[in-house]
């Protein structure tokens, strides 16, 4: 065989093997000898692409062409030559459209030479899809989570139904049960989350001495009989001692029997270092009903006096004589001197999603003070009040502190 023919033969063999080497494939190197038939095996591995959208993974398996075998017969001259194998590309990228958001998937490759396909989902944010149910459209929003980033699924129902947000911390591939989900209602319009309060000095001169400075060493709780005074034009409400708003994630600290005010935000340390004698705290908020049921208000540790109003009169018109709940510090023959006030009050039966106006006035005379409360029902159990509290709803809001009462004049009848 002359040199030209030999070179041409080697070139064709190499070109043949090059054509049979494909992405992700492997081929063996063989020695070609005279008068001998040899086989070169070219094989491609199987690739599996996993697409995940929402909670239902979809798996697509891509099979290469079957393994090919080719017989090559050489001339009588003995020689050997390497088979050219193209190495696997390091990264294969495929762009897929999900809704209106592009994202890139990469697929782990298999074979002798490894390749990695990176999965790049949209930057943490939201993907929104509008769905129509009957004649009422509603929107579902999926906020994508990764690692320890908090993930949220918000379901916005038609406006005549309430909305629920299920939120929790999730890992990239973790699924958590409903028992770990915190259920917090979401406003169906422009409601503002929060529970407002204001703290005042007690300055009603006609009863201050009996309430704040008792002569016999014991506060006269019945001397505090004008709760609507805290909401009148006669009381200077322009400069309360403290004001604040509890957010939906704040817990209301229990005001256990103490010489000091409770540590409410945003000035918790200042309040906690202020003596509570002769002080009044006013609370106002809308309670959003989580489930249709009959609800009860439970108050504990009342020291010294508590008044409560529910419904529209809690926004404007509350008076000294139309309160819905009342409790006070008192002695109990069965429990001994110093028993604090407590009580359960039926608020009423309300439908899911209803915003109930609520107003409390809590006053402490001499010595230590205290107050604690929560709402409950058979279907929900005790509620975390701030998780269901709003400073205003789509159609209603509270007046500034110091406005809106409906009956300053005329004290309450003495209760015993």
From Swiss-Prot:
Its main location: other. Sequence repeats lie at residues 90-124, 125-160. It comes from Schizosaccharomyces pombe (strain 972 / ATCC 24843). InterPro entries: GLEYA_adhesin_domain (IPR018871), PA14/GLEYA (IPR037524), S_pombe_Mam3/Map4 (IPR051905). This is Putative cell agglutination protein pfl6. Belongs to the mam3/map4 family. It comes from the Eukaryota. PANTHER family: M CELL-TYPE AGGLUTINATION PROTEIN MAM3-RELATED. Residues 224-390 form the PA14 domain. Coiled coil: none annotated.
